[in-house]
Amino acid sequence: MTDSSSHSADQRRSDERRSDNIQGRLLWSPSPDHAAKTEVTSFAAYVKARTGFDWSGDFQALWRWSVDHNVDFWDHFWDWHGVIGDKGDRRIENGSAMPGARFFPDATLSYAENMLANADDRLAISAHCEDGRHVRLTRAELKDRVMRLAGWMRDRGIGRGDRVAAYIANIPEAVIAMLATSAVGGIFSSCSPDFGLGGASDRFGQIEPRLLIACDGYSYAGKTFDRMGIVRELAAAMPSVEAVLIIPFMSDTPNMSGLPAPTLFDDAQGDSPLDDFQRVGFNDPLYILYSSGTTGAPKCIVHGVGGVTLQHAKELRLHSDVTGEDRLFFFTTCGWMMWNWMVSGLMVGTPIVLYEGNPFHPGPERLWQMAAQDGITHFGVSAKYIDAVRNAGYLPRQHKDLSAMRMMMSTGSPLSAEAFEFIYDEINADLQLCSISGGTDLISCFVLGSPTQPVHAGEIQTRGLGMAVDILDEDGQPITGEQGELCCLKPFPSMPVKFWNDPGDAKYRAAYFEHFDGIWRHGDWATLTQRGGIIIHGRSDA
């Protein structure tokens, strides 16, 4: 009789040998017609008309131009995308300093204003819950609810620089709360309600929010979890909290006793909406996100309005080819930066699809059923989710019509070459698979997809435009075809504005810039391939 642990080890070795055989195999190529119609081709034509630079359809040539002329790149992208705001005269100050560089230091804009432009009857949000609830909001309905809540905030003195903390499920109210906070010039910070009291208070307690927004509970895998007790303790633990908004997500009549100035979320959307958006500086805070906290209290990472706006628009349009004709979904909670990234889809006119709950409830078909129902074109999940679907023996395209899906995105951990092959064999043979990698630290990606390049098994397609990413050896020298440290050699707009409560930027510098002086070392082992692709091997700072 074979020992089970021995069998498991044999299976792993077999999988590893198979993955080695698949690694680098060509799995998909864009047709010339497809490439010609992409957003990045439109942008490249814009650049050629203004600078004379001709990419000749070569994405890697465009990448090289974008990092050699990184300030020009971001300046041209602002204009091509049509950022709503005043760009100001200066494009950068302290241009080579890492940290210290500031893009568009004179610019003013509002993230919410950019997100809520063209408030018409087109779909904005399609939100699903594991229990079958489904809510849809048009762009006009979304803006109306945002401006009403923003008016309530304004009337209570919440404005520029004030923090709003949200202990919240992945539901439309989360998007509304975030946009209302931005509309008044505030700073939004969120975590999901599966966090316990310690996890939530360790994060929110550091930033001293004036307003706490919370849902009364959540459900997962068919079980209901009441969170009102934790909400009371959380509010009590933060003397800065002046009021609490409660979203009755699991109960129509949540018990709000013991809370400071409690109000139901819908009751805060009154008859005195905000008339106009509060524009703030390009480098003023929009979000506070958090490190994992595995080596102490979570670090509070502050991201700026302009950096998020520019970087997300770039990644959505130029790398992911998202347009107003698409449907964008990423399986995430409000405690992961992919929520912030996905929500930015509203800025490019695409409806976003939310899912709250267990992605395997009642079975592995759940998200694929939703994808078919909503006609999702851009479908994002974690690499671990893909592995779970494979291990469950579920073959999505045998059960659901996924013909609308033209891009899959995977992140959170490296996607194996075998998982690449599974996606093309069992989900859709004619889609672009984008394994992407970046993180909370930059609220975006260092390496991601290219709609005009082929997909090779086990490889991320390209480095981000405007991102001077390279792989360095232990002496800080660039290397190709060998493992090294993934680094960024030049400033970029979505670098953190700062860490909260970090005098002199000591923690900020220690986090990224001390291993190689003045260079962002990200903490990933990676290999740059000869064709410009990236293979992520795992953490180098674990």
Per-segment meaning from a language model:
Residues 208-212, 229-244, 326-328, 353, ...:
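Conserved helix-loop-beta element of the AMP-binding
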Residues 49-54, 112-138, 251-255:
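AMP-dependent adenylate-forming
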Residues 350, 376-381, 390-455, 468:
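Gly/Ser/Thr-rich phosphate-binding loop
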Residues 131, 214-282, 392-393:
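ANL superfamily adenylate-forming
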Residues 121-123, 244-246, 257-290, 297, ...:
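Conserved pre-ATP/AMP-binding loop-to-beta segment of ANL
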Residues 60-65, 112, 125-179, 196-201, ...:
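Conserved AMP-binding/adenylate-forming core of the ANL superfamily
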